[in-house]
Amino acid sequence: MNITKKNSLFASVPVFLVFLCMGFGDVAGTLTDLVKNEYQLSNFMAGFIPFSGFIMFGILSIPFALIMARNSKKLILSIGLFIAFLGLIIPTIFGFSLFVVILLSILLLGAGAALLQVAGNPIMKDVSPEGKYSRNLSFGQFVKAIGSLSGALIPAAAAMWWGMDWKILFPIYSVALAVAFILLIISKINEEKTGSDLPSLESCFQLLGQNKNIALIVFGIFVYVGAEVSMASKLPSYLETNFGLKIEELGVASVGLFFLSIMTGRFLGGLILNWIQARTFLVISALLSLVGVAGLFVGIQSVAIVSIVIIGLGFANVFPLVFSITVEKYPGKTNELSGLMVTAIVGGAVIPVITGFVADHISITMSFIVPAIALIYVLYLGLTQLKPNIQ
C-alpha cells in the first residue's frame, strides 16, 4: 500500500521503542515474589500484583480502541506512555514504604501498557512495507520481550553489582518512557484509514456475536496470554518443588530464561517469516510449545531446563502471529479487532487463577495441563480458523 511507503525508516524507530516500553508492563508478573518478600505479603495479597497489571487490559482496551478510531493511533500511544510514566514516578514521590503505593503504580503501568498494545500493534502496519506486517510485528514483539526480560535481569544485576534491589526499575523505566514519548511526539507517521464507518461499542460486540471466527480468535488470545503468565509465575515453584532449586536463588533467573527464550524466538521469528507463511509458523509454534510443556513432566532437571527454553521459543510468536493474521484477514475492522484482542489479554489475570487452583489441589507439575490445553486450542485456531478463505 502506498501509505506505508511514505513512512520513512525514522518513523518506525519510535514505534519499536514503544514496543520496548510495552514490555515493561510484564514486570507485574516477574516482580511478584520480590515484592511479596519485601512487604511480607500473603499469597493472596501478592496475587493482586499481576491482577493489577492485567485487569486494565479488560477495562480500557475497547474504549480506547474506539477513541483511536476517531482520533489517531499516535494519540493513544502518547496517552499510554504518559499514564505509564505517571505510574512509575508515584513511588518516587510517595516512597516505597506502602504496598498500596506499589499496587497503584503497577495498576497505572498496566493501564499504560494496555493503551500501547491497543495502538502499537495496528500502527506497526502503517510503518511496515506491504506484505511485511507479520514480520515487523514479530520483530516488534522481540523488542517488547527485551522490555519484559529487563524486569527479571535488572533487579538481579542491581543486587549483584550495585547493592540495590528491584526498586531501581522505576527510575530506569521512567527515563525510557520519557525518551519514547519525546521521539513519538516529534515523529511523523502517515496512518492508514481502516474503514469508512466509525466503530462503536455496539459494533465491537456485534462483531463477536455475528462472526464466530473472530470470537474464537479473541478467545484464543485470552487463553494464550493466560498460559504465558501461568508459565512465568509457576516455573520458579516448579523448579524448587521438583529439583530443590530455591526460588530466592533461582526464581528470577528461571523467569529470565523463559523471557530470554521468548526474546530470541521473536527475533528468529522476524527472520523466518521472510520465508514461510504466518499461519504455517503459528502451527509450528504451537506444536513446539506443546513439546516443551510435555518435557516438564519427565522429571529430569536437565530436561526441564531445556523444556523451558523450548516453551519460550514456541510461545514467542503466537500473539503477534494471531494478531497480524487476523488484522490482515479483516482489514476494515482493525480498530474493533485491536480493542477486542487487547481486551482478551485480561486472560493473564484469569487463567493463572485456574492454574494455581490445580497446583494447590493436585501438584505444580500437573498445573501445566492448563497452559497445555490453551496451546492445543491455539493449534486448533491455526489449523482451522485462521485460513485466508474463512470469512
Each PLM stretch: what is its role?
Residues 60-73, 265-277, 359:
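Helix-to-loop junctions at the C-terminal end of transmembrane segments
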